[in-house]
Amino acid sequence: MADNENRLESILSRFDADWTASDEARREAKNDLFFSRVSQWDDWLSQYTTLQYRGQFDVVRPVVRKLVSEMRQNPIDVLYRPKDGARPDAADVLMGMYRTDMRHNTAKIAVNIAVREQIEAGVGAWRLVTDYEDQSPTSNNQVIRREPIHSACSHVIWDSNSKLMDKSDARHCTVIHSMSQNGWEDFAEKYDLDADDIPSFQNPNDWVFPWLTQDTIQIAEFYEVVEKKETAFIYQDPVTGEPVSYFKRDIKDVIDDLADSGFIKIAERQIKRRRVYKSIITCTAVLKDKQLIAGEHIPIVPVFGEWGFVEDKEVYEGVVRLTKDGQRLRNMIMSFNADIVARTPKKKPFFWPEQIAGFEHMYDGNDDYPYYLLNRTDENSGDLPTQPLAYYENPEVPQANAYMLEAATSAVKEVATLGVDTEAVNGGQVAFDTVNQLNMRADLETYVFQDNLATAMRRDGEIYQSIVNDIYDVPRNVTITLEDGSEKDVQLMAEVVDLATGEKQVLNDIRGRYECYTDVGPSFQSMKQQNRAEILELLGKTPQGTPEYQLLLLQYFTLLDGKGVEMMRDYANKQLIQMGVKKPETPEEQQWLVEAQQAKQGQQDPAMVQAQGVLLQGQAELAKAQNQTLSLQIDAAKVEAQNQLNAARIAEIFNNMDLSKQSEFREFLKTVASFQQDRSEDARANAELLLKGDEQTHKQRMDIANILQSQRQNQPSGSVAETPQ
């Protein structure tokens, strides 16, 4: 019991120190929320005005709404980069899981509430919790959910020694729950507490924080970070031979089982480990003490507006604080003018009592008579005036009011420009790029809030990843969301056997260390709208009927949204895949590409048919020329043989002749031989000229065929796709 009291005393002492350190900034933030959401007439302002009518002419709300809309229109994507040996594909799976959980309804509500409070009060927050995936008694699978924290400026109290915006250096944090007695009963049932143990005033205390009021019970969740050294055992895997590490606390019940499985302990180390514990307290008792939760970070994500420190005290503000004075002045001027109009609807005349004696009821202002009566004479028969003596002049609106009203309104609107509407500027005659540049200048006013939200989302990603390491420890199926919004089912911790090495491998093991960072930019839908506008502009500058025009038109079709355009979008997607421009992503799209390639191979183009005809004709003529060459060679061989035969006969005749006639016959043979040689050379020259002519004709036709074939190959592959009209 004494330990419990000491524990409570320690927690409440730290909490009071944190509460006191942030009291001034918290009070200003609460006033900003009240001014923006409830009433713009503060109680102290009543001392300085006697107006009977007090209107609220709000120009702050459009500014807040504009900033909130811009923050929602430009979502922040949380990305992971693997480190310390983590697998890149596991980082992609982790990012897909994060997107899926962020699409949950409670996650959107939590972030939207925090963003609105960031803009109005300068600070907001949400929390990450774990919950069971389903109510099956055989399943212990847990998922991560986000919960909103309303009025975070007064319900989330951080460690006063924390100096970082994301509070990653905070050693403790307190979340306060304000509830009625019925709310206490529900809270006790949720956390398995005794509902009859209601906090009361039976133990007087002098704590700064008002733990109890007449109708409200305050319950606090106290988170604290504990860093301590733990023993880690390093084993050698009997299958892979690689070292694996386990914390002694995690495997204390299965150490013998690991030894029986063949795991060999090779070393042990002392490692510094962060753990987070949660305690539930009231002002009188510690209801639950130091319960270990998943992850190694406090699961509270703060998001600040304009943030800093002044004399070691944390200060923050939103846009409302800068607009309060101008808004108050505007309300007073407008209310003053309205009060004048309401209290003096028309001029009132002055009469002598004798003028309306007996007719006073006609001038009480309650009835509207068609005519009014006056006395002509008094009681002494003296004539009386027949008209009012004078009129009560209505108070006029001071000219300074118009100037002050304009100045007050401008002061409020200067805090945040509402931007430029394309249709409202010169009837839509201003260029689209010019309007975008003007809006980009207006967006610079929200950049501080957007950048601080990116810091908060980065912190959310770090907390999410640390919780994932603890709760996703068994094989299970999860749904991941890709960057374009499509979904895919994957299995975590899937074990497969590498057929090449025979070793087991674990796929999609997301347990590891990752570097978290954010990407601030337009949403996927906004990028599609911008791409459509740019493609439309290019279509107007590209000649119709060209392959480039067809490609741009098909790309534009793929970016269409809404009902009734599914057929056009699918048609364009199929055409782009068949053209080879877009890579197939699904088995169906791969089948489209295969069919297009087969159709392309089987289709006979007229130009190609003509080229093939020229090629075959050239080949036939070449064969004909070769046959002619062979024929000439055969004829030459026959002539040579005949010449040899004739030479033999001549030699025989020459040997049988007389010596006196041999000299004459020899001269005759020389003359005949010279004549035959000249004829042979002429025939050979004619044959060579014939072959050269055939070869030149064949070469020209082959060149024509090659040119046609190269033109066919260089023609864009889009020619097989239909041209959309």
From Swiss-Prot:
Descriptive protein name: Portal protein
Pfam families: P22_portal
Keywords recorded for this protein, A-Z: Capsid protein, Late protein, Viral capsid assembly, Viral genome ejection through host cell envelope, Viral genome packaging, Viral penetration into host cytoplasm, Viral release from host cell, Viral short tail ejection system, Virion, Virus entry into host cell
Subcellular location: Virion
GO biological process: symbiont genome ejection through host cell envelope, short tail mechanism; viral DNA genome packaging; viral DNA genome packaging, headful; virion assembly
Function, in words: Forms the portal vertex of the capsid. This portal plays critical roles in head assembly, genome packaging, neck/tail attachment, and genome ejection. Procapsid assembly may initiate with a nucleation complex composed of portal and scaffolding proteins. The portal protein multimerizes as a single ring-shaped homododecamer arranged around a central channel. Switches upon genome packaging from an asymmetrical conformation in the procapsid (PC-portal) to a symmetrical ring in the mature capsid (MV-portal). This change of conformation may serve as a signal for headful packaging.
Keyword Repressor attributed: no
Gene3D superfamilies from the UniProt entry: 1.10.1740.160, 6.10.280.90
Oligomer and partners: Homododecamer. Interacts with the terminase large subunit; this interaction allows the packaging of viral DNA. Interacts (via C-terminus) with the head-to-tail adapter protein gp4; this interaction participates in the head completion. Interacts with the scaffolding protein; this interaction initiates procapsid assembly, thereby ensuring incorporation of only one portal ring per capsid. Interacts with the capsid protein.
Principal location class: virion
GO cellular component, one term: viral portal complex
Cysteine-cysteine disulfides: none
Phenotypic consequence of residue 303 to A/T/M/Y: Overpackaging
Protein's organism: Salmonella phage P22 (Bacteriophage P22)
Membership in a protein family: Belongs to the p22likevirus portal protein family.
